[in-house]
Amino acid sequence: MEVKRKVISMGERDVIQEARTTITLLQTAFSKGFTPSLDALRFRENLDQMLKGLRKARRVDNRLLMELEKFYQTASLLIGLGGLALNEEAFQAWRAYDHWHYEVVKPQLQVYGPMVLL
């Protein structure tokens, strides 16, 4: 049985490049003020994994959007509730990604199955 993935049209936007750019800026800003801790290592691993996934991505489909959402949720948890302290530059880069994520990813994301609001 062949499964066809729905490719999501985003008009003129190059979502993969925009995501790669904003996450790379976040990674660069975070690396400047990096203080080793368990949450900081998780955050850096999360950044590296997402950038690796974006390098492999060829098109914008729901799988990519779900990976971006997973990245966002994990990073948001580490920043908001974890012990991760961002310097001012990294915090501003995070806010820029946060804004971009809500503007681009959230409206296009299609979640299948039951949803639980936290």
Model-identified regions with their sequence ranges:
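Amphipathic alpha-helical binding modules
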Residues: 72-118
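Short terminal alpha-helical segments
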Residues: 2-49, 109-115
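Intrinsically disordered, low-complexity, compositionally biased regions/tails
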Residues: 15, 37, 57, 84-87, ...
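Amphipathic alpha-helical interaction modules
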Residues: 26-81
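Generic detector of well-ordered alpha-helical segments enriched in charged/polar residues
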Residues: 16, 20, 24-27, 48, ...
